[in-house]
């Protein structure tokens, strides 16, 4: 049973990693002036970067310093703040990525807690995972194991689908709204 639960955890990590890559790609493409189905974002700086690589290196240097090489994308609160720093928002401005993340922030935080629990075995990750399962399902799981949770049936689904399927479908749907 433990091997099957580990496979569910691995599948979730793969889906969540794809979600993070999607967020990162959309963000940097927005900074380069790429048009999405709803239009083009307006930047705080007033001008677009000429390449994705330049946008990425500039943002990383500005946020983390010249020696940093990457940013983390798992925390929706941090991604929303990042969007607000570089993309104009408010009346008359699109700020699509920020809007979608903000409107789904609590749910995305819970998904990040599931991810955090899979990759970290400490008190903080257990506490946050238990908080997520209590909010989503009204219970905690033995030893705070995400595999058991991801294999469990989602009672809010009209079909007999597991939480892993629910979360994957949600992430795909949110990504589709941003492109």
Regions found by a protein language model. Give the residues of each.
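Polyanionic, low-complexity intrinsically disordered segments
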Residues: 103-107, 114, 120-179
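Helix-loop junctions and short alpha-helical segments
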Residues: 1-114
């Amino acid at each position: 049973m433990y091997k099957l639960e580990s496979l569910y955890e691995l599948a979730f990590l793969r889906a969540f990693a794809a979600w993070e890559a999607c967020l990162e790609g959309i963000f940097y493409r927005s900074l380069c002036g790429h048009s999405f189905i709803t239009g083009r974002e307006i930047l705080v700086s007033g001008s677009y970067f000429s390449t994705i690589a330049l946008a990425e290196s500039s943002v990383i240097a500005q946020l983390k310093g010249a020696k940093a090489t990457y940013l983390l994308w798992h925390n929706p609160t941090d991604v929303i703040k990042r969007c607000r720093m570089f993309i104009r928002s408010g009346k008359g401005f699109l700020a699509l990525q920020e809007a979608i993340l903000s409107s789904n922030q609590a749910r995305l935080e819970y998904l990040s807690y599931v991810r955090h629990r899979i990759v970290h075995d400490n008190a903080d990750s257990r506490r946050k995972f238990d908080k997520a399962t209590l909010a989503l399902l009204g219970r905690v799981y033995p030893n705070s194991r995400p595999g058991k949770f991801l294999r469990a049936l989602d009672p809010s689904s009209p079909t007999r689908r597991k939480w892993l399927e629910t979360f994957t479908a949600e992430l795909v749907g949110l990504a589709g709204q941003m492109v």
